[in-house]
Design a protein with these regions (language model features):
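N-terminal regulatory/effector-sensing and dimerization cores
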Residues: 60-161, 207
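An amphipathic alpha-helical interaction segment
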Residues: 179-230
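Basic/polar phosphate-binding segments, predominantly the helix-turn-helix DNA-binding elements
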Residues: 250-254, 258-293, 298-302
């Protein structure tokens, strides 16, 4: 990690200084409220939960109050309780150091260093006071950018990517949040560190670099989620579908439904049932989709 970026991440902001000295924010009652599933919740004012970094390395630097056209990147304030609230946006939390105890839709979760948490819109959650070494960064995609644009792009890449995007969306729709067990992942901290360095010491192409790093982070989180599923997630009892999709993706030009069934020692009918259940598409539809996407990619390159 760049020492300058580490310094700016860990330096107390003026608001954090006040919270550490005992100041308690009392403006929650003045925030707008919204009915959600029969319960009234506070809609969080983003400027309260997140700490602006006043000691920026340069006047033009966004620090960790980076406001881009599609995403915002902010540091969560330490030493202050954030009571139960909801957002009108999706939020992605990353713990740079320490840990972060939260209650998400009634479920206590302690987010550990290098883990990532995706919180859906209108999901009630609260955050316990963060300590001196507890640094959590929030990435806030604008409107429906994450699902309507970025996830759609991944879905178009391959049948396997489409499967994982569908799984992530279904999990988030059902539970309203998704924890990525990325604490031992090699790439996630590396990509986030590069993102922070670009925020604190922006280059000429800073906006493009930040957006591409965000895209890369989301791509790696799909890999993390695949690992979670294969090791014992909600699809573990039918985890054969993951290697099956990978096999089809690699051999779509020559494989048949029968050859896929033979390779995995199951019946051709079971191939179709599995694929339909977990992807919503038949074997033929998946192969055709892969062929069309491959052709489209070739056309883009010519």
């Amino acid at each position: 990690m760049n020492l300058k970026a580490h310094h700016y991440l860990t330096t107390l902001s003026p608001s954090e200084e006040k919270y550490r000295n005992g100041y308690v924010y009392d403006g929650w009652k003045d925030m707008p409220r919204k009915q959600c599933n029969g319960v009234e919740y506070t809609i969080l004012d983003l400027d309260v939960a997140y700490s602006p970094l006043d000691n920026k390395p340069a006047d033009h630097s966004p620090g960790l109050n980076a406001e881009l056209s599609e995403i915002s990147i902010k540091k969560n304030s330490r030493f202050s309780t954030v009571p139960e609230h909801i957002h009108t946006h999706i939020e992605i939390n990353y713990v740079y150091s320490g840990s972060c105890p939260q209650v998400i839709d009634g479920h206590p979760i302690t987010l550990q260093k290098n883990q990532v948490l995706l919180i859906d819109t209108n999901c009630p959650h609260s955050i316990a006071p963060l300590g001196e070494n507890d640094i959590m960064i929030s990435i806030i995609p604008k409107t429906d950018f994450l699902r309507e644009h970025m996830f759609n792009q991944f879905s178009n890449d391959s049948i396997l990517s489409r499967f994982f995007i569908n799984a992530i969306n279904e999990k988030t729709d059902h539970d309203h949040y998704l924890l990525f067990h990325s604490e031992n992942d090699r790439r996630i901290p590396m990509f986030f560190n590069e993102l922070f360095c670009e925020c604190f010491d922006p280059s000429i192409n800073s906006t493009d670099i930040i957006m591409h790093l965000f895209y890369t982070i989301m791509a790696e989180l799909i890999n993390v989620y695949e690992d979670d599923l294969t090791k014992g997630g909600s699809y573990s009892h039918n985890s054969i579908v993951i290697p099956m999709l990978r096999y089809m993706e690699r051999n779509f030009r020559t494989c048949t439904q029968e050859s896929v069934a033979d390779f995995f020692h199951i019946s051709p009918n079971y191939v179709t049932r599995l694929l339909k259940k977990y992807t919503g598409m038949t074997y033929i539809q998946l192969i055709q989709a892969q062929k069309l996407q491959t052709a489209a990619n070739l056309l883009k390159q010519t």
